[in-house]
Amino acid sequence: MSSQPAGNQTSPGATEDYSYGSWYIDEPQGGEELQPEGEVPSCHTSIPPGLYHACLASLSILVLLLLAMLVRRRQLWPDCVRGRPGLPSPVDFLAGDRPRAVPAAVFMVLLSSLCLLLPDEDALPFLTLASAPSQDGKTEAPRGAWKILGLFYYAALYYPLAACATAGHTAAHLLGSTLSWAHLGVQVWQRAECPQVPKIYKYYSLLASLPLLLGLGFLSLWYPVQLVRSFSRRTGAGSKGLQSSYSEEYLRNLLCRKKLGSSYHTSKHGFLSWARVCLRHCIYTPQPGFHLPLKLVLSATLTGTAIYQVALLLLVGVVPTIQKVRAGVTTDVSYLLAGFGIVLSEDKQEVVELVKHHLWALEVCYISALVLSCLLTFLVLMRSLVTHRTNLRALHRGAALDLSPLHRSPHPSRQAIFCWMSFSAYQTAFICLGLLVQQIIFFLGTTALAFLVLMPVLHGRNLLLFRSLESSWPFWLTLALAVILQNMAAHWVFLETHDGHPQLTNRRVLYAATFLLFPLNVLVGAMVATWRVLLSALYNAIHLGQMDLSLLPPRAATLDPGYYTYRNFLKIEVSQSHPAMTAFCSLLLQAQSLLPRTMAAPQDSLRPGEEDEGMQLLQTKDSMAKGARPGASRGRARWGLAYTLLHNPTLQVFRKTALLGANGAQP
């Protein structure tokens, strides 16, 4: 009995070699965890993101305070000599000649930051510095209401970056250069240290931040260029000297417009000319003498950024998963399919190849649907820009808005101001939702086409659609014959032409055929109703992001919130920034500056050296002014003619009642 336990005993030196932990050779040593294959480990930058954002937020507040010292509000504080500090405006939305690239870049940066915020756990990154770690050692990220505060945080973070461009001061350009380079340096440093992240896709954060880096890179170059120009005296006295340049160009182009009708009609009509006309009506091309408002430029920029961000999210969120599933298919999939009663083949290896091929086809259908959705959305955007220009030109000429009679007043209203404020945001949201709906519809359509028609025809198996058509061909043939025979009878039997006018004939046969074919027409009507639902769904999905088009009937067009917002947006734009009205105000200021005065010129008037430049507003190439006063008189005389001919919507209340009825509805 003593020999048995003695046989199980081992020497002390052999105890470590046959320990319990050494039996599992796949276990990591030292308590380390195995990293799953293909999974990206979490990356942490050398400096916490919270510290980055804390420094950027402090710098932004400092820049905003300095800008407030530069921008003096004399109108609000007339008793103060130099004025009181005021909050600078980030963007002058209703100005016609302010730089448009800077607001577009800032809005692109803001939207890209919001897109990166959605999958991020840290809604307010700098709060993680003060957050207490949880029991497992990880810092608890703020969620819930902090996400809402994060939306306001990023808007306030980039507020000074946009306000530096509207201040019109050399110090503002210096502050903008510093702030833009700080933002760009932080973003580049973070992407360089952690190019791969485990969220959604390893390169999603890097790809989604490309518009962000592009916008910050542009701002980091634009502000230094403006700073150098201000030091070299290449710019004028700021934005005040540029306020009437677009209005002057618009009015000059309107009054000096040449007759192009003869050359247009004498041109040869062919395929190239027809294609050119179609492209002109479908794709926006700039035209001299007309600029789109800044709000529309921002909407186009935000729409392009939204298309990129949504398409990227749809691509990296689905395609890598399909590829992983296709790479992990083994022979066990045959047993899984057999459990559902699906037997593709007796050979298991052939089943694996078939499943991989079907997954590859599914991936192709998904990518094709995504490409088609992006192309259609982009074409709808370009078509909308053409419609915007057409509507604005018609409203500048005095056309009436096709809203209800209660909303046709030219004066701004509470609803109109709210719609104007939310127009660009609505446009971005509509484009995002429209692209998502189009992706779902096109993916289902391409998948059905591939798996029910193309692949069965190519491989000669799984002919489910063709077998169903084979079994139900009498039904479809009856419906087709009913439709064909009714159309033939309507053309040859029930319609007769007398003296060039078609008339009904054989009415008894017509009544009998209508009664007898009623059951078949009910079935045909069911098919037509299904087709109508599919067609209307496809049409509305494609035009969901087009706010200038109502998705409801004309009588209920005002119930469409997107269309209603667009029409009120046009009302504010035309009533507050009409180029002809701006040119008229510029002429009044220029004429006032020419009058002999003993007191100094006010701040809002032009300088004495700029009156000659303003007199060139309405002068043609043939007549040039020799002096300032004759030019001013001719300018005022020609403005009287232009003012008489132009119908300014802001002055509708001063028109005659007969002229109000002459304005046609806006198409």
Swiss-Prot record:
Interaction with RBP1: annotated segments: 235-293
Residue ranges, annotated region (Disordered): 1-20
Residue numbers bearing the Phosphotyrosine modification: Y643
The protein's assembly and partners: Homodimer. Interacts with JAK2 and STAT5. Interacts (via extracellular domains) with RBP4. Interacts (via cytoplasmic domains) with RBP1.
Alphabetized PANTHER family for the sequence: COILED-COIL DOMAIN-CONTAINING PROTEIN 180 (PTHR21444), RECEPTOR FOR RETINOL UPTAKE STRA6 (PTHR21444:SF16)
Disease as annotated in the protein's UniProt record: Microphthalmia, syndromic, 9: A rare clinical entity including as main characteristics anophthalmia or severe microphthalmia, and pulmonary hypoplasia or aplasia. Microphthalmia is a disorder of eye formation, ranging from small size of a single eye to complete bilateral absence of ocular tissues (anophthalmia). In many cases, microphthalmia/anophthalmia occurs in association with syndromes that include non-ocular abnormalities. Mutations in STRA6 may be a cause of isolated colobomatous microphthalmia, a disorder of the eye characterized by an abnormally small ocular globe.
Stated name of the protein: Receptor for retinol uptake STRA6
Biological classification of the source: Eukaryota, Metazoa, Chordata, Craniata, Vertebrata
This protein's encoding gene: STRA6
